[in-house]
Structure formats: structure tokens, C-alpha cells
Amino acid sequence: VEVFRGAAGRRLSSIECHDLCCKIAQIVVVGGVRRSALISLSNLTDDRIRRCKSGQWWVDNPQRGLANNSACYTEKPDFPAFLDEWKSLYESYSGERGMFSRVASQKQAARNERRDATYDFGTNPCSEIILRPYQFCNLSEVVVRETDSLADLKRKVRVATILGTLQATLTDFRYLRKIWKTNTEEEALLGVSLTGIMDHPVLSGREDNVKLKKWLTAMREEAIAANKEWADRLGINTSAAITAVKPSGTVSQLVDSASGIHPRYAQYYIRRVRASKNDPLCAVLEAAGVPVEDDVMSPSTKVFSFVQKAPDGAVTASEMGAMEQLELWEIYQDYWCEHKPSMTCYYRDHEFLEVGQWLYNKFDKISGISFLPYSEHTYQQAPYEPIDKQTYLKLKKEIPTVIDWDIREEDDRTEGSQQLACTGNNCEL
């Protein structure tokens, strides 16, 4: 209300629109869980959005934590302008603003010759799907295991594609304008993704990039063929774009895999999960003996600790430099994706300038990458904490092997512990 009163007689500013959208995202809660995702694309010259997470923004404007912020490029900037934005990203220590290139999206959309690439494309909140205005993503996912053969992966890709094609028939949007239905049916987009890439000897690029490219090409062709077969059966359009790599911060936790195209955090580590004290699940886990403590930052929240072990041979964050991550990203962009691979690239200070030069040289190709500083330091109750094998074995004994799930919720307790947007705060950190 204060925002609208303050803007009486004039247009809303970009930061006012941004804050209003963030506030809307903040109140979309079901069952105590945030059910919104938000990306804010802003002009390169918009300094208000560029610096909207500077200072103590989480005190004065906590709603801003609900959005991932990216600058939207309509052309390759001159080097001084790029350098200003790159320097601002470094100084933020939060990976923002990210970089979304409309030119790169148009070039990628044109590659498969099944899509009209003249639109002013945008993207979904994690920036792996290339979207027209008034359009949805339609995601399904392959869980890659370290022992998967090419035949295994093709079978999984086929199943994920069939699921996505079935989902593409669900276009009865009763409360939206007709243009949403028109665009969704016309392009029938899929988003067949891979998670656990860094757990696999071939897909992680550890064996041979030539072999990797052949496998990815075969998998992509399997997806295209499966979509055509099932779209014909269902009487819908074949998909204008099928394959992507999403960050998979949540799915990877559920299935115990490396997330998307990212490396595992460490060989052995503690994974901490927060829960509202009002959440019945909190009482179940505490009663079962799962290690728990009060959240030092939030009196109404508990922190549960689970020890984790990466698969033998899995790539970890400490083993992979920024340039290795970017080179692998480019392979997936060229040989797997019809959309984009979404990736958080972790850089050390000595790599930052080299990464910036690589990014500028390939600017018209790059979209869907965020950048965060890699740190071996941990803070109290961090979501991830590396440990050694001895500590892992010791703490593993404290985790119960059986949990009694018969406790029932008797009250409506939907005011749960909310999570913020994935960049810099949830999926990968």
C-alpha cells in the first residue's frame, strides 16, 4: 500500500515493480512451503536493481530474497560496460546480478530448426528453459547413476521424454488468458534434464570428451525420436525444444545424486536441513533421535544434521576449477541441450579474470550460468560442512535406522520455515 501511495500520479519505478512481485511470491505458501519461484530480468543500466541486494537488504526488504536477479542483454556490451557488471557481481559475493543474453537464447533456439527464434525470449527462474512471453516450462528428469551404460541412459531419457510429452497435453488453463494456452500448445515445450552428471565417469567428462559428445548426441536423438512418436500418438505438436539441464537442488537431495551438472560438495559432509518447530515432521525426526539443535539465527526453527558420503569416484567441488566447469557447460550446451544448461560456476579469486575473459569472448553463446565465489570456510550451522572419513563413520552411528511415521498431525500448521531463491542461498550453498 505504501508503494502505491508513494507512486501516486506517476509510473512505478523498476525497483517498486520488483518489490511488488517479490511480495506476491512471498505470500504464495501452501502447507508451510513456498510455492513460488521468481526471476527478475532488468536492463543493464538499471543500477537500482543491480544494487538491490546491497547493504542490509534482508532487514529492510526481506522479500527481495525471493528473486534471482539477472541483467538482460539484448546485444554484446562493449568491454567497459561488461567489466562494470562483472566487477559488481564480484563485489556482491552473492552471484548477482546474473547474466541472461536474449541474443544467445535466440541463437540457441534457432539451432534445431524446429522453433521460431525471432521472439524476445525470456527464461524460467533457474534459467535453463528458453521461453516466449506467456509460456510455461514442462520439466522431467533423468537421475544418472555412476554405473549407467549408454543403453541405460537412453532408456531413462526415453521415459522422461514420454512423461514430458504426456504433460504437454495438460493445457486447460481455466484462469489464464487464451494466449497462454495458444503458446503452450503451439510449441509443446519439454524440459528433459539430467541430474547426477558428476557421479558418472563418462558424463562428468573424466574419461574422454569425444566419447562424452557421442553419448550426449545419442541421448538427445533418443529424446527427439521419443517425443515425435508420442506426440503423434497423442495428436499434439512435436516439441519445439526438448533437452536441458536444470540445477536440481531439491530432486538431487531426494534421490542422493550430484545436483544437475554440479560437483558434489565433498567426499564426506554434513547436510543440515531446517524445519519450523511447528512442523509435525520436526517432532517425528526429533523423537526418532535424528541429531538436532536450535537454529542460532531463528528461535522458531530447528536444524537437523545428516551425514552424507559421495559415491566413490564422484567429482567434488574442491577438485574442479572454474574453467573446467565452463568447458563442460559448453559441451552440454552444444551436444545435449536444445534449451540451456543451468549451472552455478564456483570460482577462486585467482580465476576470476580468466573466467571474465572467457565469458566475454563467448558472450553471444552464454546464458544460464551464475557465478559464486568458492570458499573452504564454513560458518555456524552451514547447510553443507565437509568432514573427514573418521568423523563420517562416528556421526553415522548417531543417525537412526528406523523412524516411527505413525505420529499424526492434529492441527493446521501451515506457517512453516520458508526458503529463499536458489541463487546463493539454497540449491548449491
Task: Locate the predicted segments by residue.
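Secondary-structure capping and boundary motifs in well-ordered enzyme cores
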Residues: 16-17, 128-135, 182-193, 215, ...
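Active-site cavity-forming subdomains of large catalytic enzyme subunits
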Residues: 1-144, 148
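Short acidic, low-complexity intrinsically disordered linear motifs used
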Residues: 413-429
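Flexible, glycine/charged-enriched surface loops at secondary-structure junctions
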Residues: 7-19, 28-40, 169-182, 208-214, ...
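Catalytic alpha/beta core of large soluble enzyme barrels
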Residues: 89-91, 98-101, 108-148, 152-176, ...
